[in-house]
């Protein structure tokens, strides 16, 4: 009976412990996403690189895969610049040392001299290693609006 009461008490307490930790980590991820957006607008390849794992890739809306070196090279060259990058409907999920983020992102800028405005569903997957979150993969899907 005593063991049963302990289990019941733990069951009542555990839900209050988990979300607090998860929401703290979720806030860390939200801040990283905001800082990443600022670095993109500033065209700061060095700062952007600090958010990305060495083996990071992005899957573009056409299904192409771009690795970290190529992506940062495009940023450094100035071929891709952003004037704005705004994310809404951000959903963050934490799983131990992994986090997923989905958001609706609207961006304006220039690519190879051509102006663009995009609206995409973006997904980022972060892994926490040695106390630091790094994005390991990003994926973009055109948003048609629904």
Q: What is each stretch, according to the model?
A:
Residues 6-15:
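Bacterial N-terminal signal peptides
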Residues 4-5, 20-146:
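A beta-strand edge to alpha-helix "cap/lid" segment located at domain peripheries
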